[in-house]
């Protein structure tokens, strides 16, 4: 229900303090903005934004919202690429930005942090003591957001596992306002029932994660390697060979398609061969161990047909090479294509090269708006996530942009079904609900709907996400 905005703001100020409730249009737009290429519309705006300081204030906000049947949309840092933080029914946007505590307990060998702290800050503080965060998402993303999606970013799943493998426990505020503790404070995770596993990956529909406890992982030694191929398909074959022939997996790795590499090289001042590029980061107990593993990656790449492959010995050059992907978007921008939308496809390993080939030529031979876009391909080596970013003129009308967005999402769904993929990086809700239903069936989807109703009988928390509203 809609409530009087002035009364809502006053009531919330009484719960969290006057300085932490925002009703100005700018703030409401800021907290509703997404990666969509067109402007936020009036129907997407919350009535107000609130920043509680702790789980008790969050509890009070949720109890108030239940009493008045006001929807609450959670907001960590706004880096969601599938629009879970965009309000679907106005109401309250609840930001966890003030939950930034961090305790590193070396005696117990875990760290505990507030859900709103940025991954970049945790990486920095852990690094000072020789530890590593097994979540390598954008440095501006929040820990709570990563855990709620169960994403680890660019890291290889088979090395460190996902957050569900490294989280010892959570503090969670339920949609009805109760605060619960889950998990363990010892290094042994609970066998059998452990409610932490229910909330990890639940994408914010069952409760608000307010605190995360994770195991400490020693910082590994690393060595980087790079290889240049004629096509991305050859990289796909190399990845398949890496697994089948039991090469030591890299802890991190990226590839960039032919089109994007050229601009990336120019931006970074690199004189590298034309074609596609793969870069990997191998780890080891010590530098010698890491170097041996990196040399194995060089051997793999050469065996798979790389034009050139070598160890990146110069740290400055290595930094530039990793930056090639970050600059790849300039390939579209130099053509005046500033609107963009990315998709994610996770093919099975035997069909990885096939999917890469299809995405390389995805705009060709079409009679839709996708045919008018420029597409570039990039992704992860180790975890087979392929991303294709579609760039198009920013002066397209909003209606035209919405049409191409729908076409791109439908394309992603078709490709995921074709290659038996999942939401490996970004999760499911809300815009991948049709994919989930088609992949797993209505019965599986209805189980999630019933869980949501059990935890949130008034459908207060992130209303519209499980329904697939975008």
Language-model regions, residue ranges each:
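A short linear hydrophobic-aromatic micro-motif
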Residues: 71, 132-134, 250-252, 370-377, ...
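FAD-binding subdomain of flavoenzyme oxidoreductases
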Residues: 100-105, 111-115, 119-252
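C-terminal substrate-recognition/cap domain of FAD-linked oxidoreductases
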Residues: 25-33, 229, 236-411, 429-430
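N-terminal accessory segments
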Residues: 1-38, 67-71, 300-320, 414-442
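Glycine-rich, histidine-containing beta strand-loop boundary motifs that form or position
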Residues: 74-78, 96, 115, 136-137
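Activity-critical C-terminal alpha-helical subdomain
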Residues: 178, 428-470
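N-terminal flexible segment immediately upstream of the FAD-binding catalytic core
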Residues: 1-63, 80-109, 260-268, 316-341, ...
């Amino acid at each position: 229900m809609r409530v009087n905005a002035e009364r809502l703001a006053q009531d919330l100020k009484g719960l969290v303090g006057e300085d932490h409730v925002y009703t100005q249009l700018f703030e409401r737009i800021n907290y509703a903005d997404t990666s969509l290429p067109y402007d936020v519309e009036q129907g997407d705006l919350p009535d107000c934004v609130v920043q509680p300081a702790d789980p008790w204030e969050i509890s009070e906000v949720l109890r108030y919202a239940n009493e008045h049947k006001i929807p609450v949309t959670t907001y960590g840092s706004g880096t969601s690429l599938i629009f879970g933080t965009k309000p679907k029914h106005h109401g309250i946007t609840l930001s966890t930005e003030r939950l930034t505590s961090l305790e590193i307990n070396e005696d117990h060998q875990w760290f505990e942090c507030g859900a709103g702290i940025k991954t970049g800050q945790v990486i920095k503080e852990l690094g000072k003591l020789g530890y590593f965060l097994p979540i390598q998402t954008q440095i501006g993303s929040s820990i709570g957001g990563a855990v709620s999606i169960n994403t680890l970013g660019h890291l290889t799943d088979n090395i460190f596992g996902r957050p569900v493998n490294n989280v010892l426990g959570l503090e969670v505020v339920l949609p009805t306002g109760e605060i619960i503790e889950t998990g363990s404070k010892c290094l042994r995770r609970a066998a059998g029932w452990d409610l932490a596993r229910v909330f990890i990956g639940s994408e914010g529909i069952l409760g608000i994660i307010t605190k995360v406890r994770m195991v400490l992982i020693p910082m590994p030694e690393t060595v980087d390697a790079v290889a240049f191929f004629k096509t991305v398909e050859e990289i796909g074959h190399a990845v398949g060979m890496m697994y089948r022939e039991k090469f030591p997996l890299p802890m991190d790795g990226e590839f960039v398609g032919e089109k994007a590499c050229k601009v990336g090289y120019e931006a970074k001042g690199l004189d590298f061969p034309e074609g596609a590029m793969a870069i990997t980061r191998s780890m080891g107990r010590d530098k010698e161990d890491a170097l041996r593993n990196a040399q194995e990656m060089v051997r793999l790449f050469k065996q798979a047909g790389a034009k050139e492959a070598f160890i990146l010995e110069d740290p400055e050059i290595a930094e530039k090479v990793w930056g090639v992907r970050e600059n790849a978007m300039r390939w579209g921008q130099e053509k005046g294509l500033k609107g963009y939308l990315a998709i994610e496809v996770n093919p099975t390993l035997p069909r990885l090269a096939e999917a890469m080939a299809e995405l390389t030529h995805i705009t060709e031979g079409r009679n839709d708006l996708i045919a008018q876009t420029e597409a570039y391909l990039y992704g992860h080596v180790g975890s087979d996530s392929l991303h294709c970013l579609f760039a198009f003129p920013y002066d397209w009308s909003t209606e035209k942009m919405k049409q191409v967005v729908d076409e791109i999402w439908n394309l992603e769904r078709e490709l995921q079904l074709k290659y038996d993929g999942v939401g490996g990086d970004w999760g499911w809700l809300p815009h991948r609900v049709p994919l989930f239903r088609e992949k797993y069936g209505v019965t599986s989807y209805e189980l999630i709907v019933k869980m949501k109703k059990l935890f949130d009988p008034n459908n207060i928390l992130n209303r519209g996400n499980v329904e697939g509203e975008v």
